[in-house]
């Protein structure tokens, strides 16, 4: 009897290990959404070649897709009413700007004593390859605090609790790196529309998992 139980448990474990990579494979192969605000871009899904964006320039020189500007402004106004003062540190980036960020990160690791291969590998854990960065869509922003009025932690806490009400999601949550391909970034928020944002928030999932339903 004991032998039968052991064999049964072994078969269950084998099935779990078989299904896990299969599930990841499904998440990594996401069809291109017809909705501009639900396009999934990550290390496995590049920006569509026909993607175009009209930009609005913010007061600090950063730029975002003009279609998300009203929602971003509304979110920031709400935060300020609560005594929280966020600023957009990074908005839209061109292909060339994304390449420069990656190159600079690689150089920084080399200057710390990393080999070329290790520097490239480590840099790519933190910086997306050109063509796979949401910043190139214009609908993702890195948000920090106006340091004279708030702390980053205060801003991150407020955003985590409220951003979904304004159509934004925390794009790279903790514990989702295997699925998103990106480490936890409490500053990186992405516009997805209010319905998707609220569902993603309420279910505690990431954008890739949203498309698994």
Name every feature range the model reports, one short phrase each.
Residues 1-9:
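N-terminal Sec-pathway targeting helices
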């Amino acid at each position: 009897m004991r032998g039968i139980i052991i064999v049964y448990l072994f078969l269950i474990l084998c099935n779990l290990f078989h299904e896990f990579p299969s599930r990841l494979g499904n998440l990594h192969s996401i069809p291109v959404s017809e909705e501009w605000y639900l396009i999934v871009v990550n290390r496995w899904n590049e920006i569509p070649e026909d993607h175009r964006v009209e930009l609005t320039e913010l007061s600090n020189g950063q730029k975002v897709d003009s279609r998300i500007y009203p929602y971003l402004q509304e979110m920031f106004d709400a935060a300020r009413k609560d005594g929280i003062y966020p600023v957009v540190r990074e908005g839209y980036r061109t292909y060339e700007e994304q390449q420069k960020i990656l190159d600079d990160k690689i150089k920084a690791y080399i200057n710390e004593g990393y080999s070329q291969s290790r520097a490239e590998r480590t840099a790519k854990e933190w910086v997306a390859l050109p063509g796979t960065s949401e910043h190139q869509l214009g609908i993702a922003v890195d948000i920090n605090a106006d340091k004279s009025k708030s702390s980053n932690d205060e801003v991150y806490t407020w955003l985590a609790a409220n951003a979904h009400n304004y159509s934004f999601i925390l794009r790279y949550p903790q514990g989702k790196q295997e699925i998103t391909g990106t480490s936890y970034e409490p500053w990186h928020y992405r516009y997805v529309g209010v319905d998707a944002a609220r569902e993603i928030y309420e279910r505690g999932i990431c954008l890739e998992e949203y498309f698994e339903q």
